[in-house]
């Protein structure tokens, strides 16, 4: 095993741990909607929500880094350059996360001054981490970029996947710098803040997960490099076009020009199509050439990634980004429904797939299967779909009673929040969240359990 792959296992361990923390604070946040005075003046709703969202971003980022460190030496045929720096920044990353979590748990608030912005909370959603921590994350990403680029140079080898990954590193680092400006004009602040949220999380991450899925498909299913690289190029083209212009659906109601209404409404739904096409084409190719996967859990999570990314980010996103609908749906649980479905389909399923790839290759079994992974797979997916539908029900109740009928007043918001349809949706979110948490427990158990050794004959694929 390469030294970088051992580092990858550390990243996976940290990511799965933070996945559990995210679920814990997600359940707590769900309880606040049902019992608003819960932990009043001890640990309020907004801090629970911050920890839920921020740990989501960080555990996925750690999963991405782990996946690249796992596949980079396999793709280029040599150890990753600058491993001592990579290992150092891993521990720095973990320390930053631990300190920020402690500040959010025990300090929580600060005054409206520079000290609070630097050491307590920047006050911007998704990037609430104090400024020193954001600088630490930039340092981690710069070292990661150095590791990838220096390894490619030393190996004197570049594949199509590596070209896409290297080019994606530029916006991956640069766009995160939008976390730093502190602008007093709310419209200007939101204008650039959405570059961070949309372009960093929804665009550069889409390309990054595309690179990871391309490597996983070749590894798990023996898919032709020509197929995955072709779809990866299509994804880059769509991100450059639809991804950037799709940013417009965030610009409907923040004081930007009216032309964003038509631009944002159309282009938002195109982003998930290449990843869906890549996986569907890979499955078709595997059937044509009679290829068989040796890793059932990874295979099922890959196909789930493609399907739920298309539904969650594509269909769920498109049905609420049309400006005629978004006028009523924005800022409701309808948006939260889309957010849960999109993140889960676009990223979570893919990271779980690479976890099972690592499990198989570290345990040395020819065929990875079993029963526990099926329970984890079923509970996680059933729990997520249930949460999404519950949130959609609650969001539609808010859009109808609070916006369309009530006229978006404070009284209308309160009335909608007490509506039986809204309350039922939030109870469904809570109960299915518990199912999702049970799936997480089974997933962790299965990842930590040694698989049975079952030898299988290696199928010889027909030439592509």
Locations of regions flagged by a protein language model:
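N-terminal regions that are enriched for targeting/export leaders
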Residues: 1-46
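Transmembrane alpha-helix entry/boundary detector in multi-pass membrane proteins
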Residues: 43-57, 194-202, 257-268, 329-347
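Membrane-interface helix-loop-helix modules in multi-pass inner-membrane proteins
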Residues: 27-34, 40, 47-152, 179-186, ...
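Hydrophobic cores of alpha-helical transmembrane segments in multi-pass inner/ER membrane proteins
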Residues: 54-68, 132-147, 200-216, 269-283, ...
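Extramembrane terminal tails and long inter-domain/linker segments of multi-pass membrane proteins
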Residues: 1-9, 398-422, 450-464
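Interfacial and helix-entry/exit segments of alpha-helical transmembrane bundles
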Residues: 8-18, 81-94, 160-171, 221-242, ...
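Membrane-embedded translocation segments of transport machinery
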Residues: 193, 197, 209-327, 335
């Amino acid at each position: 095993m390469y030294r970088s792959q051992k580092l990858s296992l550390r990243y996976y361990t940290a990511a799965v741990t933070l996945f559990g923390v995210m679920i814990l604070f997600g359940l707590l946040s769900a309880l606040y909607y049902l019992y608003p005075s819960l932990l009043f003046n001890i640990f309020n709703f907004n801090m629970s929500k911050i920890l839920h969202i921020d740990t989501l971003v960080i555990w996925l980022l750690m999963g991405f880094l782990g996946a690249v460190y796992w596949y980079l030496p396999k793709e280029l045929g040599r150890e990753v350059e600058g491993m001592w720096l990579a290992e150092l920044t891993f521990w720095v990353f973990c320390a930053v996360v631990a300190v920020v979590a402690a500040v959010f748990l025990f300090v929580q608030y600060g005054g409206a001054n520079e000290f609070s912005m630097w050491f307590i909370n920047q006050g911007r959603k998704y990037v609430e981490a104090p400024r020193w921590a954001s600088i630490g994350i930039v340092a981690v990403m710069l070292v990661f970029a150095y590791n990838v680029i220096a390894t490619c140079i030393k190996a004197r080898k570049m594949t199509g996947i590596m070209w896409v990954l290297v080019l994606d590193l530029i916006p991956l680092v640069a766009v995160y710098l939008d976390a730093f400006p502190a602008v007093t004009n709310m419209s200007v602040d939101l204008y650039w803040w959405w570059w961070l949220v949309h372009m960093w999380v929804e665009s550069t991450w889409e390309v990054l997960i595309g690179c990871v899925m391309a490597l996983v498909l070749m590894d798990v299913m023996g898919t032709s490099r020509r197929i995955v690289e072709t779809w990866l190029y299509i994804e880059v083209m769509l991100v450059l076009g639809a991804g950037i212009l799709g940013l417009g659906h965030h610009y409907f109601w923040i004081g930007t020009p009216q032309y964003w209404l038509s631009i944002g409404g159309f282009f938002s739904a195109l982003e998930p199509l290449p990843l869906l096409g890549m996986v569907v084409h890979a499955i078709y190719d595997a059937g044509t050439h009679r290829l068989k996967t040796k890793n059932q859990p990874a295979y099922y999570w890959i196909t789930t990634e493609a399907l739920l990314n298309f539904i969650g980010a594509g269909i769920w996103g498109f049905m609420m980004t049309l400006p005629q609908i978004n006028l009523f749906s924005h800022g409701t649980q309808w948006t939260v429904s889309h957010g849960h479905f999109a993140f889960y389909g676009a990223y979570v399923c893919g990271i779980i797939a690479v976890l099972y790839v690592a499990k198989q290759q570290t345990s040395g079994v020819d065929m990875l299967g079993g029963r526990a992974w099926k329970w984890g797979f079923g509970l996680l997916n059933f729990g997520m779909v249930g949460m999404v539908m519950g949130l959609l029900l609650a969001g539609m109740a808010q859009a109808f009673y609070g916006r369309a009928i009530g006229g978006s007043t404070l009284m209308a918001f309160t009335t909608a929040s007490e509506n039986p349809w809204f309350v039922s949706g939030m109870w469904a979110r809570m109960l299915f969240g518990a199912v999702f948490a049970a799936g997480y427990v089974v997933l962790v158990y299965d990842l930590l359990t040694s698989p049975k050794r079952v030898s299988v004959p290696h199928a010889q694929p027909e030439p592509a």
